[in-house]
């Protein structure tokens, strides 16, 4: 199998509290890794370390063989995208503008091309009728899928999902499961944080347990 991410001895603490220590993990293209642990144990912090938003106390992360500290941060966050629990959608923008703003600002894509790319994914995710809706007009499941689409538009090879099924009903959870399955089949690697262990067991081929002062366990 071909490695895309190597995490070596990753450790992070806040003050005297160790969140996680000596986490070792190798990820191949298309792997789906689940992270479970008690609330406040550092699962989201772990995700932020992986895409360079937070520096670990020690340890190393390699993306396609290169230390992430040596990769341009703008490029790194396109290669390793993150979907936060609260989705981080701009409430004053409609869906199509939420999806195209980064394409235009970061990738310098013109408006027509950006909108064509966004509409293509909206159709694929059965959300084309929502392109002019605002975030407060969307259901939780729709907001989640819009946030995933926005990340996909940047062309990531790794996607980090923070509690992707929180507050979703069974139907929307199943839709998220299908999305994860398809992304994995397309060789996109996923790291998923969730408090729902049954969901993690269903979607993941590797599981890490993170707790206060615990080592990561696969």
Per-region residue spans from a language model:
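The feature captures the beta-strand-to-loop junction immediately N-terminal to the Walker
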Residues: 36-38
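Helix-to-loop junction immediately C-terminal to a conserved catalytic motif
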Residues: 51
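Conserved ABC transporter NBD signature motif
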Residues: 59-67, 76
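Conserved signature/switch motifs of ABC ATPase nucleotide-binding domains
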Residues: 133-136, 154-155, 186
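Catalytic Walker B motif of ABC-type/P-loop ATPase nucleotide-binding domains
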Residues: 159-162
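H-loop/switch region of ABC-family ATPase nucleotide-binding domains
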Residues: 194-195
């Amino acid at each position: 199998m071909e490695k895309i991410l190597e995490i070596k001895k990753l450790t992070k603490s806040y003050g005297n509290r160790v969140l996680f220590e000596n986490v070792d993990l190798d990820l191949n293209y298309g792997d789906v890794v689940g992270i479970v642990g008690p609330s406040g144990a550092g699962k989201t912090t772990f995700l932020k370390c992986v895409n360079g938003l937070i520096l670990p106390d020690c340890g190393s992360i390699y993306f396609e063989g290169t230390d992430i500290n040596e990769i341009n941060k703008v490029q790194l966050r396109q290669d390793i995208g993150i979907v936060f629990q609260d989705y981080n959608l701009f409430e004053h923008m409609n869906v199509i503008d939420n999806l195209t703003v980064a394409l235009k600002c970061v990738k310098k894509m013109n408006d027509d091309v950006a909108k064509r790319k966004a509409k293509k994914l909206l159709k694929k995710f059965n959300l084309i009728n929502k392109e002019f809706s605002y975030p407060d007009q969307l259901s939780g499941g729709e907001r989640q899928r819009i946030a995933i689409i926005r990340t996909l538009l940047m062309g990531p090879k790794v996607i980090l999902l923070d509690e992707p099924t929180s507050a979703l009903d069974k139907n929307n959870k199943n839709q998220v499961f299908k999305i994860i399955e398809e992304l994995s089949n397309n060789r996109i690697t996923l790291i998923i944080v969730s408090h729902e262990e049954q969901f993690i067991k269903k979607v993941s081929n590797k599981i890490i347990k993170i707790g206060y002062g615990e080592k990561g366990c696969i």
